[in-house]
């Protein structure tokens, strides 16, 4: 309804158009003071101390219009010195020295060089140098890709960063944009247009400066970080409702509903389709509702919105507007098509065509209730009317800016493939139809993080994969679960299996791992405040939420070698488990590198892992490993959040042990375009000493529409011993096992004091102090969380195993003395170390028990118990 009202207002005040798209304060023409002319044929523009535009023109005419990539060259002019003679020009900034020998031939290794430092060593670049050390960027699509085996059609493209310290962006043949931000051809002449990024290993700085000239990566609406449900399958509106209802009935949240192409008439599309005059399968393009499945689209959208969902429809627009489409007459009238009865070719790069397309074809569907579009362009890469213009890029540009201009009250976004440099301005990304293999799962973290090298930070993958090789395969519960666990730490959380009866993603079809899947969904929703923080940082700095380790550790070789690992925001080291568990123990083992500079807290096991080491670590299917920097503070949602339509009133602050730390927590309204200026920041700090922990929440700074004056808190202090008392703003609050607001409790399974506070004024300082008993250390609790959670998960299988032989006998006393430790702590939290000491004393006894004669359990289950309970703990203590 909100979007409908916005649309009606626009229609009353303006004629529909997409040419008025804007990029804020972007000014394509550089400040004259940044420009250096060198003879009659060369021009250099000093954009930053390490970024220089280098142009050579045969006729001495240079280009000041925006290109598809570079839209803003009017930056603050850096300090630089120019030395000119009739034969040579030298430009020296604080970081680089450019030398050009004046002449009438294009740039080459003899007449141009740029000197700078990389990791303290002198680097010299000249034209034609090998760029094999480039750290790469991304590609248009992962269609048909198995693992890292890119197709020849869509190879991984070069990025803006290199181990050699430089990267060249050749903008020579890129299309331009006119004063209305519409596509314009470059003059055909002898001309070179290069940008050198000479940042050495200052990778984050290079990306920040890239956004100055190419535009920021917009902040998507908060709701887009929830679960996207999608399947290429023929569904009716009532079937879609049933699926959403069933997902929610088993406690799986959903925020985005994607309706694939069967929403429209497919005109008899089958496995041997008839082709139209454009070489496309008849029925692949469509704009006419398939009324047998969707008899009342407005009612379907009303239900979806009432259910808190955003919706999208799939588009394959390559076949233009066909005479059999319901919108044909309306489009022809708006466009002025003078060949009635003949199809109108797709021509998105013609302004008149694009305007008519939106007004006559798409906007009526939006008025029915559709929220955004999935642009599933898979056809010819370049325009038939502007050779060299990427259809993917221009579709994204037009659709995004149309939404931005015509729905000013809402934050625009679409779902699409990568169209080349500059595509970061149009979130979000669809990575395509991948092959379902363990190798594809393993590659997606690397691919996603590497895409940060061109600031493309919002890839959405088909979690679980899209299709089997040759459409022949069998779903695997463990693999799908591991994919969902990885997806928690990816930009978008989406499934999308292909149209095949063997490709199904209904969680209830995987009972053996259903609970682990549900836990992954819940963790994703808990992580959204942290994710949204990282998304804002992408907007501010140009660093995507998933980025390679070498951004932070550029001189460490492991940062380039461990490609399955990546940073998820600034405080979380993430990975994926892309191997099946051992057939006997169920444990999957991965190699991990923990960067130097701080320790890392394993959120799965509770172990504190020293930085500067590699480890071989085993995890069960119940474990989803992620590692937080010691001392960090992770903002989270409480465990009950199942929708992102509105922000939760309760903020969970998870304080990680091992060091002091801080957090800047970002908030805005989550939906509008006003986030550039209307937002708040809340600064949080934790300070730890031997016998106390102090968490300080400073008054909120800033404002945005609809913000509240108070909030509730759930403050969790991971792996911290039971306090002797807890003070809130200097006043002691009581302990309660089942705590309410104004009380604290002890979460024994996480070994964490938890403080609950309600209606805390956000404009006042909040101080929470844990006074800890002397004589013992929190480090004695490290790695116990893993034992507790594994015992909790394996106790029932243990009972079942033993019950096959004797259903009346108790579990072994050696096991119970270990597994029941958290229950003892919950009953008597002040006696925590008594029970922890008992566990540590009894663990060797349990190991001896497993080594002896145990007729009630099989050798295989003994091995499983040992691997889960004993070996994992011993490994984490190293």
At which residue positions do the language-model features occur?
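Catalytic and substrate-binding clefts that recognize carbohydrates or anionic sugar/phosphate headgroups
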Residues: 84-222, 231-232, 244-249, 552, ...
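Catalytic core of carbohydrate-active enzymes
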Residues: 421-429, 443-444, 451-461, 468-694, ...
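Solvent-exposed beta-strand/loop surfaces of large extracellular or lumenal domains
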Residues: 66-79, 337, 601-621, 725-755
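Aromatic- and carboxylate-enriched substrate-binding clefts and catalytic-loop regions
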Residues: 253-517, 552-554, 562
